[in-house]
Every structure is written in structure tokens, then in C-alpha cells.
Curated annotation (Swiss-Prot):
Protein function: Essential for biological clock functions. Determines the period length of circadian and ultradian rhythms; an increase in PER dosage leads to shortened circadian rhythms and a decrease leads to lengthened circadian rhythms. Essential for the circadian rhythmicity of locomotor activity, eclosion behavior, and for the rhythmic component of the male courtship song that originates in the thoracic nervous system. The biological cycle depends on the rhythmic formation and nuclear localization of the TIM-PER complex. Light induces the degradation of TIM, which promotes elimination of PER.
Source lineage: Eukaryota, Metazoa, Ecdysozoa, Arthropoda, Hexapoda
Domain of life: Eukaryota
GO biological process, one term: entrainment of circadian clock by photoperiod
Region (Disordered) residue spans: 27-120, 164-188, 194-213, 250-274, 332-361
GO molecular function: transcription cis-regulatory region binding; transcription corepressor binding
Protein name: Period circadian protein
InterPro entries linked: Period_circadian_regulator
PTM annotation: Phosphorylated with a circadian rhythmicity, probably by the double-time protein (dbt). Phosphorylation could be implicated in the stability of per monomer and in the formation of heterodimer per-tim.
Gene Ontology, cellular component aspect: nucleus; perinuclear region of cytoplasm
Signal peptide span: none
Bias (Gly residues): 93-114, 201-213, 250-261
Assembly and oligomerization: Forms a heterodimer with timeless (TIM); the complex then translocates into the nucleus.
Cellular location(s): Nucleus; Cytoplasm, Perinuclear region
């Protein structure tokens, strides 16, 4: 960015100055290993080493580069720096740099070189030119490195923005992020309830009543063509789809499950309509009531058939089913008990001529098949099924 203050040349060149200083191999050997010289040369060389150790190359370049921060250094510091930077070419000739601050330190690089090429005399103009070139080079490197890192940051920022655009709801959505997926189920919340009220095929999922019958079933129009299809046939004229379906897959040989229930215009051959029972009212079966109803066969039609004097054409409630042993139910029409030792389920005895309640009429209009090993719910406070009443009366 153009608003930032660019780093100075000395900051950028600090590491290179350190490397160049240690690669120049400054003389740090003890006195015994130096070549024999005059005593004054030993002292001057020692002073030169001390001055070189206190003056870093960075400070030398600041004084020669004209940055203004170290203007107190004179050309002696330039000569001192020439001796530091050129010792690799001129051997160990640093004997003339004893007084580096007096401005007159002569013979800076005329040491005892071992046949090397004479070094170029460093002037302030050459050092300034070198510093300018190196500063441009270092600033260029700095900008390139900053540019690469800036491009990486921009790419990562763009990718993050794209991810937010893909995952966010967008400007056209009215919901927030938390409600982003709620539209998929808000409209479907009432669908199971509507299916219960409109198409109540309970247990078999629409199999019992051939796709489900309406809530109000006219039992006089219920077709009995599916009643003689076996023990596990389809529902009683479509009532199987409403009350629970029983086993609506048709195990008794009925190839088409809904064949007998789909047409309600067939003439009724129900066993109660054959016996001239007044069962013309509609039965209102509520959808939440789920009781498995199985169809009776023609063999067991005499078990549940009760004389029509015990029925009253009243509006019905839900039928409650009792457990009736098959032997007692079979012996009820003939009046003979084939199994006298078997205890009867009901302790209370109702007179068959007693006028039944409205629930008895509902139970009478729903033809039932009582299995021998199945317990049916029987609250004894309400009533006894007419077949049970007849069976207990015959006993």
C-alpha cells in the first residue's frame, strides 16, 4: 500500500550486512600468531580491531549513505568500512585504521596483500551510488513479497465471500439462516391429520378398505362379496379401511383386495339385512379409534347372529368387544353346552329380552368374528355383547 512508510535500507539490508561482515574474516587472532611487526603496529592494529568491533557495518553505511542520522562520522569511517569490506581481497591488511575518527587516517587499504589485485578506492559518491542501487533492489524485493502475500490474502477473502454467498440465504429470501430449511416441512405439518380425516385406512395403509372409505359408512350398501373370502380377507364392506384395516392384504384367496369394496352400489347381501334388521342408519366411526376388525365367514354367521328382537335402531357409539369362547358361542343357537367344564368369562348374566343400549346396536351392526385365543377389551360397566348375552342365557 502506498500510504505505508517504506522500511529503510538499513532495515532491509541488516541480515546481508551481518553476513558480509563475518564473511570478510576480520582479524581476531591472538598476538602471538600475528606476523612480526613493530610494537606500534600491534597497538594500532589492536585499536583498529576495537574500533571495528564497536562500529557495525550498518552504522558505517548510515554515515556514508548520507541519511542524516549519523552525520558525525567523517571520511575516516569510510576508510574504515573499506578496510572491513575489502579484507577478503587484501588479506589481513588493516594496519592503517587505528584512528578512524580523526578524518586523516591514511593508508587504509595498503596493507601487506599477498599478490591480490589492488582494491578500488572507495569514495563517498561510489558508496552513495551503491546504497541507492541496493535500496532500490531491496525495496523491489520487499514490494514483491508484500504483493504475493497480499494476493494470497485477497484470494482467501474472495473464497470466503463465495462460501458465504453459497451458504447464505441470499437477498431474495425472507427467512433468516436459522429458518432456511423450515419451508420444507411447514406446509407438510398437517398432512398426516388430513389423511386421517379424509382417507383413514388405518393398519394396512389403505389396504383394508381398498384405499380407504369415507367417514360415514352406509352399512346397507356395504358389499358382502369380500366377507366369504377367508378369515383374513379385506374389511367388512370398506369398514376395514376406517377402523384399522385388520390384515388388509387378503390372505384368504382374494386376489384383488379392493374388488368387493370399491363399488358401494351393489345390492347388500349382509346377514343382518337378510334377517330384516333395521340397520339403515349411518355409523359415524371416528378416525383415532383403532380396533382391529376381522371379517366373519359364512361358517360363523350363526355364532354372532342374534334374533332381531334384541336390536334397537339407535345412533351408535364405539363397539366394545368381549371374549367369547368358540365352544360356547357355537352351542348357543342349539342350546347345548359342549364344554361345561370351561369357565365362562362373564360373571354377570343379562336377560336376552332386556333392551340393549346404543352401544349394543353398534356392536350388532358390525359383524365380528371372535377368535378363541384373543382377549377383547370388555369394560363390564357398560354392556355385554348380544352374542355373549345369548350365550350366557343359554348356559
Amino acid at each position: 500500500s502506498s500510504t505505508e512508510t517504506p522500511p529503510s535500507y538499513n532495515q532491509l539490508n541488516y541480515n546481508e550486512n551481518l553476513l558480509r561482515f563475518f564473511n570478510s574474516k576480520p582479524v581476531t587472532a591472538p598476538v602471538e600468531l600475528d606476523p612480526p611487526k613493530v610494537e606500534s603496529s600491534y597497538v594500532s592494529s589492536a585499536r583498529g580491531e576495537d574500533a571495528r568491533s564497536t562500529l557495525s557495518p550498518v552504522q558505517g553505511f548510515e554515515g556514508s549513505g548520507g541519511s542524516g542520522s549519523s552525520g558525525n562520522f567523517t571520511t575516516g569511517s569510510n576508510l574504515h568500512m573499506s578496510s572491513v569490506t575489502n579484507t577478503s581481497n587484501a588479506g589481513t591488511g588493516t594496519s592503517g585504521t587505528g584512528n578512524s575518527g580523526d578524518g586523516g587516517g591514511g593508508g587504509g587499504a595498503d596493507g601487506t596483500g599477498s599478490g591480490a589485485a589492488p582494491p578500488v578506492t572507495l569514495t563517498e559518491s561510489l558508496l552513495n551510488k551503491h546504497n541507492d542501487e541496493m535500496e532500490k533492489f531491496m525495496l523491489k524485493k520487499h514490494r514483491e513479497s508484500r504483493g504475493r502475500s497480499g494476493e494470497k490474502n485477497k484470494k482467501s477473502a474472495n473464497e470466503a465471500m463465495k462460501m458465504l454467498e453459497y451458504s447464505g440465504p441470499g437477498p431474495g429470501h425472507g427467512h433468516g439462516i436459522k429458518r432456511g430449511g423450515s419451508h420444507s416441512w411447514e406446509g407438510e405439518a398437517n398432512k398426516p391429520k388430513q389423511q386421517l380425516t379424509l382417507n383413514t385406512s388405518g393398519g394396512g395403509g389403505g389396504g383394508g378398505g381398498g384405499g380407504g372409505m369415507p367417514l360415514f359408512l352406509d352399512m346397507t350398501h356395504a358389499s358382502s362379496s369380500s366377507q366369504n373370502k377367508g378369515l383374513a380377507g379385506v374389511g367388512v364392506g370398506g369398514a376395514g379401511g376406517v377402523v384399522g384395516g385388520g390384515s388388509g392384504t387378503g390372505l384368504g384367496g382374494n386376489g384383488n383386495v379392493g374388488s368387493g369394496n370399491g363399488n358401494n352400489n351393489q345390492p347388500s347381501t349382509n346377514q343382518y339385512t337378510q334377517s330384516r334388521l333395521p340397520c339403515t342408519q349411518n355409523i359415524n366411526l371416528w378416525p383415532p379409534f383403532s380396533v382391529g376388525i376381522t371379517t366373519p365367514t359364512s361358517v360363523l354367521s350363526s355364532h354372532t347372529a342374534v334374533p332381531p328382537s334384541s336390536f334397537s335402531p339407535q345412533h351408535s357409539l364405539f363397539p366394545t368387544f368381549y371374549y367369547i369362547p368358540a365352544s360356547i358361542a357355537a352351542s348357543s343357537p342349539s342350546g347345548t353346552n359342549t364344554n361345561p367344564n370351561r369357565p365362562h368369562k362373564h360373571a354377570h348374566v343379562h336377560n336376552s329380552s332386556e333392551k340393549p343400549s346404543t352401544s349394543q346396536a353398534a356392536a350388532a351392526t358390525m359383524p365380528l368374528q371372535y377368535m378363541t385365543g384373543v382377549m377383547y377389551p370388555h369394560p363390564s360397566l357398560f354392556y355385554t355383547h348380544p352374542a355373549a348375552a345369548a350365550a350366557t342365557a343359554m348356559v
